[in-house]
A protein has these predicted regions:
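N-terminal, motif-rich segments that launch catalysis or mediate targeting to/interaction with membranes
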Residues: 2-88, 106-142
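Short alpha-helix carrying the canonical HExxH Zn2+-binding catalytic motif
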Residues: 87-95
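Short active-site segment of divalent metal-dependent hydrolases/proteases
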Residues: 95, 99, 103
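Long, charge-rich alpha-helical interaction segments
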Residues: 137-157
């Protein structure tokens, strides 16, 4: 069984970004690490549902939308409610957005030229990162750290 595409890259990127954040922001993330980790997967987390389902289609639509209104609305709620949980989620989601925005032009170009499919390129990128960081791609499942809870869903919605 191959690893889930892109999961490890987003987790690793979030870990690396974390080291550059202010102590105050790191504290917010430490207190709400599960929400941060869920945010790291952005709308990709919706792709793990049944193919062609409403949930999966929502993830596809979210990838095509302009992100600014999403972040503006989220940060408005953070400021209004002083909501550190939502802030941690949005920080993770921002990491997801930054990594996708940087990598996807190359991914799309390779897929368009039929060099390699989008999903396979992302899987291979994850596999390479796992090997470079000492993880066995066939025994390491980075998504195991994503813990679904109704309380997290309420924060996100």
């Amino acid at each position: 069984m191959s690893p889930m595409p892109t999961t490890y890259a987003h987790d690793l990127f979030g870990q690396r970004v974390y080291t550059f954040l202010t102590p105050e922001i790191r504290q917010v993330i430490r207190k709400n690490k599960n929400l941060f980790r869920i945010g790291l997967h952005g709308p990709d987390i919706l792709f793990y549902d049944i193919p062609n389902s409403r949930v999966t289609r929502t993830g596809i639509v979210m990838h095509r939308e302009v992100a600014a209104p999403f972040f503006e609305r989220g940060m408005t709620l953070v400021r209004q409610k002083h909501d550190e949980k939502l802030l941690a989620y949005l920080l993770g989601f921002a990491c997801h957005y930054l990594l996708d925005s940087t990598c996807h032009p190359y991914v799309y170009e390779m897929a368009e030229k039929e060099v390699i499919s989008h999903t396979l390129l992302e899987k291979e990128f994850d596999r390479t990162l796992m090997l470079e960081t000492g993880k066995n791609p066939y025994h390491y499942y980075p998504s195991c750290g994503v813990i679904p809870r109704m309380t997290y869903a309420r924060v996100i919605h």
